[in-house]
A protein has these predicted regions:
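N-terminal active-site segment of His-dependent metallophosphoesterases
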Residues: 1-66, 72-75, 153, 159
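Anion (oxyanion) recognition and catalysis
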Residues: 71-72, 99
C-alpha cells in the first residue's frame, strides 16, 4: 500500500493583499499528477486545508474539485482532518457527498466517522477519533485523535 501524507495547504491565503490562488491552483494540478504517477492508494490531508475559518468560495471550489480528481471515482481512499486554521464543521459539511468518492472528513478530534461504504472502501468500525478500514491484506486503523493509545488486542484504550 502506498500512502502519501500532506498538510498545510492554506488555500485562499493572501500575502500583503495579493492572492496566492493562482499559485495554489498550479500546485494542486501538479499534486494530482504526482498522486496518479506514484499510484498512491491512501492520501491523508492533515489540517490547515484553508488559511482561515471563512475561506473564499474560490478556495473551497478548488479544494472540492481537487478532491474529486484525487479520489479517482472512489478508488483512492482520502482522509481529510481539520487543522487549527479550518472551521471543523464547515470542513465536515460535504462529508455525505464525499462518501461516494472515498473521502472521509474529520472536523474535530473526537469525530465518529459513520461506518459503511466510502467509494470502493468500507469503514467497518469507528469510535471517537478512530476508524477501521480493511485494505487488501492489511487493515488500516486511522487514529485521527492525537496520541490515542491502541491496545495489543486492537481495542482503543479508555485513557
Amino acid at each position: 500500500m502506498r500512502i502519501l501524507h500532506t498538510a498545510d495547504w492554506h488555500l485562499g491565503k493572501n500575502i500583503e493583499g495579493h492572492s496566492r490562488m493562482d499559485e495554489q491552483a498550479c500546485f494542486l494540478a501538479d499534486f494530482v499528477e504526482i498522486v496518479k504517477d506514484e499510484k498512491i492508494d491512501l492520501l491523508i490531508i492533515a489540517g490547515d486545508v484553508y488559511d482561515s475559518y471563512n475561506p473564499p468560495a474560490r478556495a473551497e471550489e478548488l479544494f472540492y474539485e481537487t478532491l474529486k480528481q484525487l479520489s479517482d471515482g472512489g478508488k483512492r481512499l482520502i482522509l481529510v482532518i481539520a487543522g487549527n486554521h479550518d472551521n471543523p464543521q464547515r470542513l465536515e459539511a460535504p462529508g455525505p457527498l464525499a462518501r461516494d468518492h472515498g473521502i472521509l472528513m474529520a472536523g474535530v478530534p473526537k469525530t465518529i466517522i459513520p461506518t459503511g461504504a466510502y467509494g470502493q472502501h468500507q469503514v467497518v468500525a469507528a469510535g471517537e477519533g478512530l476508524c477501521v478500514i480493511p485494505a487488501s491484506a492489511d487493515t488500516i486503523r486511522f487514529p485521527h485523535l492525537n496520541y490515542i493509545p491502541i491496545l495489543d488486542n486492537g481495542a482503543v484504550s479508555p485513557i
